[in-house]
Regions:
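DNA-contacting surface of Y-family translesion DNA polymerases
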Residues: 2-128
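Acidic, metal-coordinating catalytic segment for phosphate/diphosphate chemistry
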Residues: 100, 105-211
């Protein structure tokens, strides 16, 4: 099934054929065009990579993309997270157990902040090895209105970042996730554009508004 032409499966079995092809290839892609309503106490995204990723910079690109994807879902749910976790699965040739790590954070749904948390966990745990699967999860939610402001915080800068994030979300909601991409989306290791072109109406898990 994994080696079948997905277009033939689609023409023969419809959407069910495409779903079978995705599952056979270890890909879990959910259509999230509709506003997300969380049913669980965690939001996450995982993907099986199309090849082994051995360079740290390439893995970082994937981690950044997934951190952003789940951050979008978090804002759609009008929540902030207080716990960030990651998981890295290695290639069969590595004969190694997967790596897991998590950390407690100040309540946030800011993309850049969450990317930094995810990369911090990655740098603490990963030393070497061919990575074949990646997962990013956020949990322990509070309402998006909840937050801490200290005397040392630049309130004006925080509000500026929130307005910018809101503007980016609005553009993507209107024109699709790929209407605004980071520069590293042009690199070979990136998966954002490739996943946006998946057939059968599937969109990259966590990419609200992806077209």
């Amino acid at each position: 099934m994994a080696n079948f032409n997905p277009d033939i499966l689609k023409s023969s079995l419809g959407v069910a054929g495409v779903d079978l092809w995705f599952h056979a290839n270890g890909i879990d892609e959910s259509n999230v065009h509709k506003p997300y309503k969380p049913k669980s106490k965690a939001l996450g995204n995982s993907q099986v990579l199309p090849r082994d990723y051995t360079k740290q910079r390439d893995i970082e690109i994937i981690m950044r993309e997934m951190a952003e994807q789940v951050a979008i879902r978090l804002r759609r749910a009008h929540k902030k997270t207080m716990c960030v976790s990651i998981s890295l699965g290695f290639s069969k040739s590595e004969n190694r157990r997967s790596l897991q790590a998590q950390m407690t954070v100040e309540p946030t749904n800011n993309t850049d902040t969450l990317i930094n948390h995810v990369l911090e966990l990655f740098h603490k745990k990963y030393t070497s090895g061919a990575v074949r699967s990646v997962a990013v999860n956020y949990s322990k939610f509070v309402d998006e209105s909840f937050g801490f402001i200290s005397l040392f915080d630049d309130v004006e800068q925080i509000e500026k970042e929130e307005r910018l994030q809101s503007a980016i979300d609005n553009i993507r909601n209107e024109f699709g996730f790929t209407s605004l991409l980071r520069a590293n989306a042009l690199e070979e290791a990136s998966r954002s554009r490739a996943r946006s072109k998946l057939i059968g109406g599937h969109s990259a898990g966590g990419l609200d508004g992806l077209r």
